[in-house]
Amino acid sequence: MIESSSPTPPALHEGAPADVSHPRNIRSFVRRTGRTTVGQAKAFADVGPRFLLAYSGLPMDFSAVYGRDAPTILEIGFGMGEATAHIAGLMPEKNFLCCEVHTPGVGALLKRIDEQALTNIRILQHDAVEVIDHMLPLGSLDGAHIFFPDPWHKTKHNKRRLIQAPLIAKLAARLKPGGYLHCATDWQPYAEQILEVLSAEPLLKNTADAASDGYAPKPGYRPLTKFENRGIKLGHGVWDVVFTRA
C-alpha cells in the first residue's frame, strides 16, 4: 500500500485506455473520436505503408517484419507517441511493436517516425488483446510497456481496467525468460492494483525491493512527457511497476 496524507487527485491518462462490453471481454481501448491533422494525414500517406502493419490473426515473424534479428518490445497504447518515439530513438538496437487504435495518435507517431528518421517501430492499429492472443508467439517478447492506462476511477468501473490477471498471464507467457513488463500510472488505487496483479502472477518477479513498497524507480529510458509533467503540476504522483519473467 502507498501512504498518502491527502486525497488522491483525479488522474489523467495518455496511453492504453480500456473499454469493455462485458467484464469477461476486456479490450485495450475505449472508442474515441478526434481529428487527424494535415501533418498526421500526410504521415499516413508518406510513411504509413512502411510502418503500419495489418492485423492478420497469424503468428508474427519479427525477423521478417523488421528485417533483422533484434530484441522486440511491445507497447500497449501509446497516446500521441511522444514517449514511444523517445524510447525508440534511445534504443535503435531494439524493435518496438506498438498497438494503438486512436487514429490521431497513430498519425502523430507516424509523423514523429518521419521527423526523427526512426526505423525500429512498427504500428498495429488494432486491439492489443487480440494481437496478443493471435499474433504474438509464446516466449517471443523481450519486454512490454503499458504507460498510463485508463484508470477507470469509479469503483463500479474498476472491472474495465486493462491490467487484470488474465491479460497479465497472457503477457507473461509471451515474455522470454528475463524479459520485463513495465507499467506506469498516476492513479494511486490503480498502482496498488497493478502491483497486486503482477505480484500474483507466478511467472513474474518484482525488480523492486521491499524498502520501496514494491514500486520501481522511474527507469531512465521512460521520459517525462508533456502529459506527465502536466499531471505532476496538478499534484499527481506517478508509480512505476517493473517485473521480469523468471
From Swiss-Prot:
Organism: Polaromonas naphthalenivorans (strain CJ2)
Origin: domain of life: Bacteria
Binding residue positions for substrate: K154, D186, T225, K226, F227, E228
Similarity remark: Belongs to the class I-like SAM-binding methyltransferase superfamily. TrmB family.
Pfam families attached to this UniProt entry: Methyltransf_4 (PF02390)
Primary enzyme class: transferase
Keyword annotations: Methyltransferase, S-adenosyl-L-methionine, Transferase, tRNA processing
Function as written in the Swiss-Prot or TrEMBL entry: Catalyzes the formation of N(7)-methylguanine at position 46 (m7G46) in tRNA.
UniProt gene name: trmB
Active site per the UniProt annotation: D150
Pathway: tRNA modification; N(7)-methylguanine-tRNA biosynthesis
Region of interest: Interaction with RNA: 156-161
One GO cellular component, as annotated: tRNA methyltransferase complex
Residues that bind S-adenosyl-L-methionine: E75, E100, D127, D150
Segments for region (Disordered): 1-23
This protein's record includes keyword Transferase: yes
Keyword Methyltransferase among record annotations: yes
EC annotation from Swiss-Prot or TrEMBL: 2.1.1.33
This protein's name: tRNA (guanine-N(7)-)-methyltransferase
PROSITE patterns assigned to the protein according to its UniProt record, in alphabetical order: SAM_MT_TRMB (PS51625)
Reactions catalysed, as given in the entry: guanosine(46) in tRNA + S-adenosyl-L-methionine = N(7)-methylguanosine(46) in tRNA + S-adenosyl-L-homocysteine
A GO MF label: tRNA (guanine(46)-N7)-methyltransferase activity
